[in-house]
Amino acid sequence: MNLTAILLTFNEEHNIARTLSALSKLECVLVIDSFSSDKTVQIAEGFPNVTVLQRAFDEHTKQWEFARSLVESDWTLALDADYQVSENALNEILEIE
């Protein structure tokens, strides 16, 4: 499956590693960060399948639209950084044809 996960972040250092670890099976994870003042960006950049871009927050919808405009995959999984993604759920998503 050609799938990109998108996460919107702002000061999520306490959540981001858990979420990105759960998405390690994916080839592409895009993090759109709203200029966090904590270690969110540094943590996310430590994952080899993650691309981090920063964009000033103006509207939630515009953050998602910006992220989606960058994605070339057929499928997009949109998540907040504090979502807990189980291995079973991700496996089921990846089995969709």
Please annotate each region the language model reported:
Residues 6-25:
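Short, well-formed alpha-helical segments that are part of the catalytic scaffolds
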Residues 33-42:
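A conserved acidic beta->alpha catalytic loop
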Residues 56-71:
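Glycine-rich, basic loop-to-helix element that forms the pyrophosphate-binding segment
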Residues 45-50:
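Short, conserved SAM-binding/catalytic segment
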Residues 32, 55, 79-81:
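Catalytic metal- and UDP-sugar-binding loop of GT-A-like glycosyltransferases, i.e.
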Residues 39, 61, 79-96:
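Acidic donor-binding/catalytic loop of UDP-sugar-dependent glycosyltransferases
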Residues 2-4:
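Cell-envelope/extracellular polymer assembly enzymes that use nucleotide-activated donors
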Residues 76:
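Short aromatic/hydrophobic "clamp" motif used to bind/position activated sugar donors
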